[in-house]
Amino acid sequence: MIRKDQLPNIWNDDWRCAAAPQTVAIGAGSEEKLVLCAADDAPLFMLRDDGPYTVMPDVEHMTVTVAEGAGLCLYRLQGPNTPASHLTQLEVVLQRDAWVRMCTVTLGGGHVRNNVVVRMRGEGGSCVANGLYLMDREQQCDNYIFVEHAQPHCQSGELYKGIVDDAARARFNGHVLVQDGAVKTEAYMTNRNILLTDKAHVDTRPFLEIYNDDVKCSHGSTIGQLDEQAKFYLMTRGISERTAVTMLSYAFCDEVIRSIDIESLRDAVGDMVKKRLHGELTSCADCAIACKNPCNGPNAHFDIDPSKL
């Protein structure tokens, strides 16, 4: 069930801010799917629609408790067209043998910050948290995730990927804490980033804090550019440079997209990412993935559907 402790949206003309506090309780033994979607023309949980260029910030705070043996799939879609600021705070508590699978797809925004806190309060808990962010112009996306392993035999895995274009910025801060009694813990954390211009910037900091030896844990991060050899190979097969860049970018994103369990949602997100890479969802003067400037040639399109490769 979803229990709303307060009004679902709080509006103040002076603050010009929408807030959406919610508490979600998943009963023992049940499995639920929850999709949070920000439309292209409005921020998440907007009380009013100010159009595609609204500057009103919004704040979302959600607390989720997953009871013994229960599970939750939680997906958040953040649209690209608004320069508004978004702040989301998600806190998840897992009881014995409970699990949660999360995926956050950020296709743009002014300044987006996603905070995720997961606490393993019972044995056998499992958490998978994935994220994808595509930023351009002067947009900024910050992802902060904290996972606490407080009980034995729990597992967690985080995979966040980002493509940062133009003068955009992205930050990833991941922290996994393994307490002294949390033996047989398995925890993995990865952050991968592609920079498409020399003005784009990424800060990444995956961090493990472990207080016992009976664990399997790893973490890592990468920041780089598209594979020039792969791009050249595609171009030698008659594919334009623009399309080759778009195809390689989509292939980079596909691992996160495929982690979405709901087939119809997975297909819809895949289509949105393709449109984003085509430049159909946003535009700017000189970015590499979303440029509609005629001097840079026609809009990108796929000669081949990369999802079929």
Please report, for each region that a protein language model flagged, where it lies by residue:
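Short, Gly/Pro- and small/polar-rich lid/capping loops
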Residues: 1-25
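Conserved beta-strand/loop scaffold segments within soluble protein domains that form the structured core
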Residues: 17-232, 236-239, 260-309
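Small/polar glycine-rich anion-binding or flexible loop at a beta-alpha turn
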Residues: 248-254, 273
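Short arginine-rich
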Residues: 252-262
